């Protein structure tokens, strides 16, 4: 039985004495080494590789749809031995090194030892931070071949996405930097301005040249300036803030810990953490992703990255931060919880980063963010650097910058709200549900490899479509908000590794997640907000790689986004189908439910510095009054988030009446 239940390298029969209850497995511990025992998940599918809670396709399938790329030598059954040896997963590693099994007991454990001065570290907490700061100097730790393979992979490892073939073409993307005394951009990873140790880690990650956002953000942050940055999805925003923050940390060393909180001898385990850098992001998946990147670039340094988020065992997270926490990646809710428990102090913060800031406010995190920034012991805006990164910056976010940033530089890379030319966009007309199914099966049957991400509007549709594809012998799984955290993580893991190369998702995967090797994004259900479309298709064509995005357009259901979708295609120099031009023209004549300037930040100047273009006194997050950017912008004419008098408004594209900021379609969920 234990052999039958060995799922993706997870030995569910090999736990501790008596096979007692298993511990929660945090996402950043997926595939990591450390600690005793190799327990698998407590619950999960036992009959196949489908989504959690559903049986996958039979393991005996040898031919997929029309002998497509899904068919033949891939074994999508979740049962069997080491996942690295399964068909469709990563190739076996060399040098007699095998991908380790999941280890829920390794959270914060291990035997690496050490600390700032040699006290009780271990496990992943020391995997990135085994250097020292001694006598005012940064002393990198020794090379660890195993950790390097874990963090950086190998050149042919499909689970690690490296620089794409079109990366150099990013030089053609326009960049606008506004503010006084904007520093000159950098064009190479070199010293100065970057620290030599960081450059060595960047080389291990196989990054050759900075992306446009990195070319500007590195000298801006290294020069001590605050930054508000808009950049295309997948353009390297994470490196844009991690590189300068870590480089400065390697040069200046740790901040002193208050004497009242030091352990014996001044170092070692301490009850309260005093991070010097704080990165806030909206979702558990995104903070885990940023944490993984921080581990890469902090490798062999004195800097200890940590991650905290809701839905995970708080005891494990407390033990983690007790071992030292220099760079903290967190979701707002869990961070507030740990602050209330007296386990994290923000008094040493030098750098505050708000990533996906617009989505954090969309999800209702503004009270927590304001409490963290303004209501705790964080240094005030004059005594810290604040960086805001996102793919869009609508008016209410730019207004928030007045409270959180000082004398900042506004950086717009490319046309924010536009899409990458690395993505080939196709729009297909459908008249009813059967058309969608037929087109989808045709697309999947001609798929040439890589991962396919399919977006639907509702949780029910995600499960139904995933089940249908499995019944067609296609290896699919699904992810949405009704899944448990463990189920979502397992589905994402199987998708990333190619065990289930088709993922049906609601909006939970639409923002921020960096899933390597996604070659095709299909908008099975078009969203009602064009910005959501931009973020969805941004899951492919990342880091300079090419990708395909296909959208199913129904004249009856999707005419509200026809004009904006047409503009997106024109901006990216894509083919324009005649039916889309007809739909946009009919909509402009017929008025209807316009979005008051084109959704969140589009048409209202979401990629422009509002300090240059002015704006009314109203608008804003709660609507009402003045109209936003030079009139007609975000919240124009009393619209906004819930402002009086706007409603859905009339007047078609960009029409008067403001447009409700909410969710006209009704079915969309943040999950």
From Swiss-Prot:
Sorted alphabetically, which InterPro entries does this protein's record hold? DEAD/DEAH_box_helicase_dom, Helicase_ATP-bd, Helicase_C-like, P-loop_NTPase, RNA-helicase_DEAD-box_CS, RNA_helicase_DEAD_Q_motif
A molecular function (GO) term: mRNA binding
Any single GO CC term annotated in Swiss-Prot or TrEMBL for this entry: spliceosomal complex
Sorted keywords for this record are: ATP-binding, Cytoplasm, Helicase, Hydrolase, Initiation factor, Nucleotide-binding, Protein biosynthesis, RNA-binding
Cellular compartments annotated: Cytoplasm
Quote the record's binding site residues for ATP. Answer: 231-238
Compositional bias segments (type: Gly residues): 107-130, 589-612
One Pfam family for this entry, by name? Answer: Helicase_C
Q: Where is this motif: DEAD box?
A: 355-358
Residue ranges of domain Helicase ATP-binding in the record: 218-411
Q: What is recorded about the domains?
A: The Q motif is unique to and characteristic of the DEAD box family of RNA helicases and controls ATP binding and hydrolysis.
Functional note: ATP-binding RNA helicase involved in translation initiation. Remodels RNA in response to ADP and ATP concentrations by facilitating disruption, but also formation of RNA duplexes.
Protein name according to UniProt: ATP-dependent RNA helicase DED1
Give the classification, highest ranks: Eukaryota, Fungi, Dikarya, Ascomycota, Pezizomycotina
């Amino acid at each position: 039985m234990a052999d039958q239940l060995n799922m993706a390298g997870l030995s569910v029969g090999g736990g501790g004495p008596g096979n007692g209850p298993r511990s929660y497995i945090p996402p950043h511990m997926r595939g990591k080494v450390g600690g005793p025992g190799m327990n698998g998940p407590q619950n999960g599918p036992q009959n196949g590789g489908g989504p959690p809670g559903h049986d996958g396709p039979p393991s005996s399938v040898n031919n997929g749809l029309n002998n497509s790329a899904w068919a033949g030598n891939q074994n999508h059954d979740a049962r069997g031995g080491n996942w690295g040896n399964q068909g469709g997963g990563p190739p076996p590693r060399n040098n007699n090194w095998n991908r380790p099994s999941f280890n829920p007991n390794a959270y914060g454990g291990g035997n690496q030892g050490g600390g700032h001065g040699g006290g009780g570290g271990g496990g992943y907490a020391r995997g990135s931070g085994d250097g020292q700061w001694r006598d005012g100097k940064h002393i990198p730790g020794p090379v660890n071949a195993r950790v390097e393979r874990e963090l950086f992979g190998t050149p042919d490892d499909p689970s690690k996405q490296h620089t794409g073939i079109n990366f150099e073409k990013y030089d053609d993307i326009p960049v606008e930097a506004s503010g006084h005394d904007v520093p000159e951009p950098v064009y190479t990873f070199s010293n100065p301005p970057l620290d030599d140790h960081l450059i060595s880690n960047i080389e291990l990650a196989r990054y050759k040249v900075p992306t446009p956002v990195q070319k500007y953000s590195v000298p801006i942050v290294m020069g001590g300036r605050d930054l508000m940055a808009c950049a295309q999805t997948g353009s390297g925003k994470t490196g844009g803030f991690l590189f300068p923050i870590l480089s400065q940390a390697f040069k200046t060393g740790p901040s002193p810990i208050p004497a009242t909180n030091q352990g014996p001898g001044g170092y070692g385990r301490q009850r309260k953490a005093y991070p010097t850098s704080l990165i806030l992001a909206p979702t558990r998946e995104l903070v885990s992703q940023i944490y993984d990147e921080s581990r890469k670039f902090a490798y062999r340094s004195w800097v200890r990255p940590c991650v905290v988020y809701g839905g995970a065992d708080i005891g494990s997270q407390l033990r983690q931060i007790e071992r030292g926490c220099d760079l903290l990646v967190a979701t707002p809710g869990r961070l507030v919880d740990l602050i209330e428990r007296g386990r994290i102090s923000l008094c040493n913060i030098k750098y505050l980063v708000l990533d996906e800031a617009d989505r954090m406010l969309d999800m209702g995190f503004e009270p927590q963010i304001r409490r963290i920034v303004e209501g705790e012991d964080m240094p005030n805006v004059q005594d810290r650097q604040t960086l805001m990164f996102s793919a869009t910056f609508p008016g209410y976010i730019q207004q928030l910058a007045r409270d959180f940033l000082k004398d900042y530089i506004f950086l717009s890379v490319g046309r924010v709200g536009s899409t990458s030319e690395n993505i080939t966009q196709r729009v297909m007309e459908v008249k009813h549900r059967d058309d969608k199914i037929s087109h989808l099966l045709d697309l999947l049957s001609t798929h040439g490899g890589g991962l396919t991400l399919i977006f639907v509007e509702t949780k029910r549709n995600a499960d139904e479509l995933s089940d249908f594809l499995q019944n067609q012998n296609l290896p699919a799984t699904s992810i949405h908000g009704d899944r448990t955290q463990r189920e979502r993580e397992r589905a994402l893991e199987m998708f990333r590794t190619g065990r289930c190369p088709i993922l049906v998702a609601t909006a939970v995967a639409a923002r921020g997640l960096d899933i390597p090797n996604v070659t095709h994004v299909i908008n099975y259900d078009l969203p009602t907000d064009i910005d959501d479309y931009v973020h969805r298709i941004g899951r492919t064509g990342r880091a300079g790689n090419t990708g395909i995005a296909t959208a199913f357009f129904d004249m009856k259901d999707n005419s509200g986004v026809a004009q904006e979708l047409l503009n997106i295609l024109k901006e990216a120099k894509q083919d324009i189908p005649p039916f889309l031009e007809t739909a946009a023209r009919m909509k402009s004549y017929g008025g209807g439910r316009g979005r008051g300037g084109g959704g969140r930040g589009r048409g209202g100047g979401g990629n422009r510095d509002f300090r240059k273009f002015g704006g009314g006194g109203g608008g804003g997050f709660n609507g009402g009054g003045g109209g936003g950017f030079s009139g007609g912008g975000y919240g124009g004419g009393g619209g906004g988030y819930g402002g009086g008098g706007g409603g859905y408004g009339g007047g078609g594209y960009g029409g008067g009446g403001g447009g409700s900021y909410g969710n006209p379609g009704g079915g969309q969920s943040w999950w």
